[in-house]
Swiss-Prot record:
Keywords: ATP-binding, Magnesium, Nucleotide-binding, Transferase, tRNA processing
Binding site for ATP: 24-31
Function noted in UniProt: Catalyzes the transfer of a dimethylallyl group onto the adenine at position 37 in tRNAs that read codons beginning with uridine, leading to the formation of N6-(dimethylallyl)adenosine (i(6)A).
InterPro entries the UniProt entry points to: Dimethylallyltransferase (IPR039657), IPT (IPR018022), P-loop_NTPase (IPR027417)
Protein name as it appears in the record: tRNA dimethylallyltransferase
Assigned EC number: 2.5.1.75
Taxonomic source organism: Synechococcus sp. (strain CC9311)
Gene: miaA
């Protein structure tokens, strides 16, 4: 694991370039702070949010708007259609190339997002299994239903299952795909080979996170989550794994008559709050961010980055 306390020694600048990562749970304010930091230091933003890698999933993922992307150049957004899954290994390869290019051009790279596993793969050199997507197997798993799939994973690879939420169809299917294709559980196939970067992790974890999540959920429904979900369902079918993820799953139930919009908003809020709790646990156990705890997160982050650039 990259440790912050050893990054900024007297010779650190000569040894390796600096990668700054702004992390934290959903609705913690990462997007707004990332834009301010990028503008202050004249940086570009590299996305590490797993759902924002997909095109046509804008509202439900709180993807940076067109106006925000005009303010600051973003990378690693809209890489594929939502019916073309991106494996962790594929993300790692694409993101490593993007980081290397930005470092070459600007001397510092700036990551922002809430997907801890993707951050770990990129900054700690996690080596995921090289198993390509298996379309037929995924169709079979989808037909079983997510509850059965997660139960299968608990039996076959309890270590991997413990790290995946029961409702997370995308990661559950991927873990089973790796297991059935290679004969080895995913948890036994991951090693690390850290890249030659210094990594400064900055974390956001506001006290009012629960109310921020409730406000964010209401906002995405008001902005058109139901219509976005309708279009995705019509184009790719209602069994699309990405339509089982938080927000889209509840919106799909509204469209199918299973939930009222008010019920869907309440369920999405609850699921997001549960997910945010898991995100905080992940960042606490798997990373060592400087938590921005002061009243002025921007000034605190600027000071830490300037020290890193030193």
């Amino acid at each position: 694991m990259n440790q912050i306390n050893s990054e900024f020694g007297p010779d650190a600048g000569a040894k390796a370039p600096l990668v700054v990562a702004l992390v934290g749970p959903t609705a913690s304010g990462k997007t707004a702070l990332a834009l301010e930091l990028a503008e202050h230091f004249q940086l570009e933003i590299l996305n590490i949010d797993s759902r924002q890698l997909y095109r046509e999933m804008d509202i439900g993922t709180a993807k940076p708007t067109a106006e925000q992307q005009q303010r600051v150049t973003h990378h690693l957004l809209d890489l594929r259609s939502p019916d073309q899954p991106i494996t962790l290994q594929e993300f790692q390869q694409e993101a490593t190339a993007a980081v290397s290019q930005v470092l070459k051009e600007r001397g510092v790279a700036f990551l922002a997002g809430g997907s801890g596993l993707y951050l770990k793969a990129l900054t700690q050199g996690l080596q995921p299994p090289a198993v390509p997507p298996q379309a037929e197997l995924r169709r079979q798993l989808s037909s079983l239903g997510q509850a059965n799939c997660h139960q299968l994973l608990q039996q076959a690879d309890p270590q991997a299952a413990a790290k995946i939420a029961p409702a997370d169809a995308v990661r559950t299917q991927r873990a089973l795909e790796v297991l059935y294709s290679s004969g080895k559980p995913m948890s036994a196939q991951q090693s690390t080979n850290p890249p030659p970067w210094r990594v400064l992790e900055l974390g956001l974890n506001p006290m009012e996170l629960r109310s921020r999540i409730a406000q964010r959920t209401l906002q995405i429904y008001q902005e058109g989550l139901l219509e976005e979900t309708r279009q995705l369902s019509q184009r790719y079918g209602p069994d699309l794994p990405m339509l089982q993820t938080i927000g889209y799953g509840e919106a799909l139930e509204v469209l199918q008559g299973g939930l009222s919009e008010a019920q869907a908003i309440a369920t999405t809020t609850r699921r997001t709050q549960q997910f945010a709790k898991r995100q905080r646990t992940w960042f606490r156990r798997q990373h060592s961010p400087h938590w921005l705890t002061g009243q002025d997160a921007l000034s605190e982050a600027i000071r830490l980055i300037e020290a890193g650039l030193g």
